[in-house]
Design a protein with these regions (language model features):
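Short loop/turn and low-complexity linker motifs enriched in small/turn-promoting residues
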Residues: 20-155
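Sec-dependent bacterial lipoprotein signal peptides
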Residues: 1-20
Length: 155
C-alpha cells in the first residue's frame, strides 16, 4: 500500500512539474508604454491580469477573447487588447473549467479583469472577474506583458 502511495505521489509531482510551463513574453518596451494606461478614444481597452498568488502557480490558463485563444497567463502576467465598441466575451480556460465573462465596452473605456486559480477536482479552476481601475492598475503595474499565443505554438 505504501508503494502505491509513493508511485501516485511521484506521478502527481511529475505532472505538476511538467505543467509548470513558461509562457511567451511580450515586448518590455510595449509593456512599459501600456503601463501608462493612456486610453484610446477610438477603441475600448482591456487588461486581464493574473497576480502572484502561489496557489495554482503551475497552471497557465488560456485567455480566449471572442472565441479565439489569444494568450496564456502565468503568475504576475497580464494580457492587453484593444477592441471595437460593443459586446465581447473573455474566457479563462483550464483543464477542468471555463470561466466566461461577457462584457460591453465603449470607445475610450478601460476595463480591468483579474484572474486566479481556485480549487478543482482534477486541476485548478481558472476564475475571472472585473476589478476596480485602481486594483487593475496595481496588478498590471507589478506584472509583465505576455506575448500572443501564436508565439508559444511557433516554437
Amino acid at each position: 500500500v505504501i508503494r502505491i502511495f509513493i508511485r501516485v505521489g511521484a506521478l502527481v509531482g511529475t505532472a505538476l512539474l511538467t505543467a509548470c510551463q513558461s509562457v511567451p513574453m511580450g515586448d518590455p518596451a510595449r509593456s512599459a508604454e501600456l503601463k501608462k494606461f493612456a486610453p484610446n478614444p477610438n477603441a475600448g481597452q482591456i487588461y486581464v491580469c493574473r497576480d502572484d498568488r502561489f496557489f495554482g502557480a503551475a497552471i497557465t490558463p488560456t485567455v480566449e477573447l471572442n472565441g479565439k485563444p489569444v494568450a496564456r497567463l502565468a503568475r504576475s502576467n497580464y494580457f492587453f487588447a484593444e477592441l471595437p465598441p460593443g459586446d465581447h466575451t473573455v474566457v479563462i480556460k483550464t483543464l477542468e473549467h471555463d470561466s466566461k465573462f461577457p462584457f460591453k465596452i465603449a470607445a475610450g473605456q478601460q476595463t480591468f479583469f483579474s484572474t486566479w486559480i481556485s480549487f478543482g477536482i482534477i486541476a485548478g479552476r481558472g476564475i475571472i472577474d472585473t476589478v476596480t481601475t485602481e486594483e487593475g492598475k496595481k496588478c498590471v503595474s507589478s506584472s509583465e506583458l505576455v506575448g500572443p499565443i501564436e508565439a508559444a505554438t511557433a516554437k
